[in-house]
Design a protein with these regions (language model features):
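Active-site neighborhood of HAD-like aspartate-dependent phosphohydrolases
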Residues: 1-36
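Structural motif
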Residues: 6-7, 99, 147-148, 243-246, ...
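Long, contiguous domain-sized segments
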Residues: 214-217, 273-426
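Long, charge-dense
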Residues: 257-282
Length: 426
């Protein structure tokens, strides 16, 4: 039988490694020191903490009860499995956690991340930290204890003569720390969540692909979505249409962050440069009041479409190589064409290029021209991580998006980059 620490060993928080970020999510920055002081003054129980919140603040019982409900809802919503450890848990194992949550609360969180119901749960305020638990007969029933805390999960059990394994991968990476240092703790938390949810065996191609998307594409998509939202707030379009194929992941992240309706514009360089009658009819139906959002480009195809048809589209690129004409600006001007190519490749879709649309506006596609395996891994990692983002990033600038795009260029699989076709670069 193995005993397991729970927080940051089996379950992660979307808000990040520091649990007080949940307090900020619930009540704002000013609430954090109140909540922390209440915990210090309390009897170290969940109910006792909120009794102290009311004592400190003088707030009404109804207001404090709402904060309590909101904090628990945030904990549940932000819980994710640390995959490489959860897959090791067996039905007869035991969870031992120093926490202010009750055993029933930890059970609810454990259920959410897929822990078997037959796993026993033991909770206390500091029995592991103080060493009291490790002196018990129950602790000696375990062949091994696994946890992330240097003292509680490593030093204390070993001092009691028990086998222990310290889990260190839950600590933030240097990239995650850099985003948090720049004020984007919600981005760092989402990237960390994606990284720790990696379901693939270490050393496999799938693990590498997932890891790259978690580290680089999750921050890029979150920051890009925030920049698009700011632009759209100023432009005030009736709707946003994200351009197929490379912007489909961005559309999903945008919707997850802002809960605003989005649509997909099924188009390609081919359809814009040589539009059929059906494609023209499709564009005319879609264009009024629509802002078209493309992930990366030079604007050549859009300008050629306007020249040939006289139809001017309200078009914006997230990333470009230079300042474009007023009808097709780029929100972030990249420092090199290779970075833009990498962004496209990391955000490939697993359906073929649009060659035309039918009379109903349904896409007609060419066969898929690249390996779908890494594409599908990138998609799942990117969406799973981005959906766990606690709140939309704030204060995003073009430079932040450029920095994130440059990280994508370093992380994109070289085997997929080699498959990038010439027609994708126009």
């Amino acid at each position: 039988m193995t005993s397991w620490d729970f927080f940051d060993t089996l379950m992660g928080r979307a808000a990040g490694h520091e649990p007080w970020r949940v307090f900020e999510t619930v009540g704002g920055a000013a609430y954090v020191p109140i909540r922390q002081e209440a915990e210090r003054r309390s009897d170290r129980t969940w109910d006792g903490i909120f009794d102290q919140v009311r004592e400190i603040t003088g707030w009404t019982a109804a207001r404090v009860e709402q904060l309590k409900r909101d904090e628990w809802a945030a904990e549940v919503a932000g819980a994710f499995p640390i995959a490489e450890n959860v897959t090791r848990v067996r039905p007869g194992d035991r969870i031992v956690s120093d926490t202010y949550f009750s055993t029933l609360q930890v059970r609810e969180l454990a259920d959410r991340i897929g822990i078997p119901k037959t796993v026993q749960i033991v909770t206390s305020w500091d029995a592991k930290w103080s060493g009291q638990w490790w002196k018990s007969e129950a602790a000696r029933q375990a062949d091994l204890h696994v946890g992330d805390n240097q003292r509680s999960d490593w030093e204390q059990p070993r001092a009691a003569g028990l086998r222990a394994e310290r889990y260190a991968a839950g600590r933030p990476t240097s990239q995650e720390t850099a985003w948090e240092r720049d004020g984007f703790w919600e981005v760092a938390g989402a990237a960390r969540a994606a990284r720790l949810m990696n379901p693939h065996p270490r050393g496999s191609d799938e693990h590498r692909w997932w890891d790259g998307a978690a580290a680089a594409n999750v921050p890029f998509l979150l920051l890009a979505a925030a920049l698009v939202h700011e632009y759209a707030f100023t432009a005030r379009p009736s709707r946003l249409a994200f351009v197929s194929r490379d912007s489909i992941l961005l559309s999903k992240v945008y919707h997850a962050l802002y809960r605003e309706p989005v649509t997909i514009f099924d188009a390609s360089r081919q359809t814009l440069r040589n539009p059929s009658a059906d494609f023209l009819a499709y564009v005319k139906r879609l264009a009024p009041g629509t802002l078209f959002v493309d992930l990366h480009g030079t604007g050549k195809s859009v300008r050629e479409f306007t020249r040939k048809t006289g139809i001017e589209l309200a078009y914006v690129f997230v990333c470009g190589q230079r300042r474009l004409a007023a009808h097709a600006p780029a929100l972030a001007t990249l420092r090199g064409i290779g970075t833009g190519t990498a962004v496209e490749v990391m955000n490939y879709h697993d359906e073929g290029r649009v060659t035309d649309v039918d009379r109903e506006g349904r896409p007609i596609r060419a066969p898929l021209e690249y390996d779908p395996a890494p594409v599908r891994v990138h998609r799942t990692a990117s969406i799973d991580g981005a959906r766990l983002c606690c709140r939309p990033p704030r204060g995003v600038t073009a430079e932040h998006v450029i920095r994130a795009a440059e990280a994508v260029a370093k992380a994109v699989p070289r085997e997929l980059l080699r498959q990038h076709q010439v027609e994708h670069r126009g």
